[in-house]
Amino acid sequence: MFRTLDDANVQSKRVLVRIDLNVPMANGEVTDLTRIERIVPTIAELSRKGAKVILLAHFGRPKGVASDENSLKHVVKPLSKVLDHSVHFAEDCIGDKAKAAVDALKDGDVLLLENTRFHKGEEKNDPEFVQALAANGDLYVNDAFSAAHRAHASTEGLAHVLPAFAGRAMQAELEALEKGLGNPARPVVAIVGGAKVSTKLDLLSNLIEKVDALVIGGGMANTFLAAKGLDVGKSLCEHELASTAREIMAKAETTKCAIILPVDAVVGWHFAADTPHQTYGVDSVPGDAMILDAGELSTDLIASAIDDAATLVWNGPLGAFELRPFDTATVKVARHVAKRTKEGKLVSVGGGGDTVAALNHAGVVDDFTYISTAGGAFLEWMEGKPLPSVDVLKK
């Protein structure tokens, strides 16, 4: 297990809290507050318990160079609004400016330090930079699971030099992931969709050793269909990965993991919304058409696999969900998962950028057991890779 805020005495302590503020911006305004909302419980609890709360975060990819566009000062207003608490700001995360701002804090105050990536030492996990950050703290709390796969100074380095704890968002994520794949109720079904097999090879290899059934959808399903000798017409397909797809299917047989591929497909002749479309069996896709979604027989097949499951892990859409009506399979299956979850019959964990967008589109994002907003870290966890900044929090 890992250390949480329950294990920490924070009264009058300077607590460095690593958070995720990599929020979408347009014209200097934050356009989506989801990530800010996720960190409220940790900051509010620390402030309530009388800690001096010092927030560390990165924004964008400034590569060690300070700039106005990547400054965290733009986030101060929305952050204090969501927190319902005033937030002080320091124009640097180390050195005199940071020290002066920290020294001025009273118990319960909240201070945001400037972008950690304005210093090259952040991404290099440079020991001198770690010490410069640590100089302003007595304890360290990591609440940024989305950066857990990066061993940077503020995500991993600090945990070696200060007493380290998981924040509430980090804790919720780790507990949900443990239920999803770490120690899940069986049978477990995974849905993996999206465009390309090439970006999900490690994921597929890991999942077939851990799950009882694997649903493959989206563009990547075409590569598997082609590998089985079927003609996928002009569909998005990585023909050069046919032998890899066959290896994955063979490995799944030995690990007793059922692979579920589409049996029918909705095809169109143009990659556009509302283009004329028709449903065909996957063995009779016209040579001049492209597969844009899974058909009704396929979604029924997936729904029945979900009915047999106790746990479901989802990464990636089942079709070109951003183009109607090719969002049908994704929406239908997502709503079925939501229904089973609400009935208490399924633990459902979803994550990854496109997945969150697709589940939002289906209107079910609040009905899953847990939705990870982490992207890369969620994928690496699904791939079974170690997460450096989580490992250092273990008791």
Curated annotation (Swiss-Prot):
Predominant subcellular localization, coarse grouping: cytoplasm
GO cellular component, one term: cytosol
GO molecular function, one term: ADP binding
Annotated keywords: ATP-binding, Cytoplasm, Glycolysis, Kinase, Nucleotide-binding, Transferase
GO biological process, one term: gluconeogenesis
Catalytic activity, reaction form: (2R)-3-phosphoglycerate + ATP = (2R)-3-phospho-glyceroyl phosphate + ADP
Pathway(s) served: Carbohydrate degradation; glycolysis; pyruvate from D-glyceraldehyde 3-phosphate: step 2/5
Domain of life: Bacteria
Compartments where found: Cytoplasm
Binding residues annotated for ATP, in chain numbering: 200, 322, 352-355
Coiled coil segments of this chain: none
Pfam families in UniProt: PGK (PF00162)
EC number: 2.7.2.3
Enzyme class at the top of the EC tree: transferase
Binding partners and assembly: Monomer.
Family: Belongs to the phosphoglycerate kinase family.
PANTHER family according to UniProt: PHOSPHOGLYCERATE KINASE, PHOSPHOGLYCERATE KINASE 1, CHLOROPLASTIC-RELATED
Protein's name in the database: Phosphoglycerate kinase
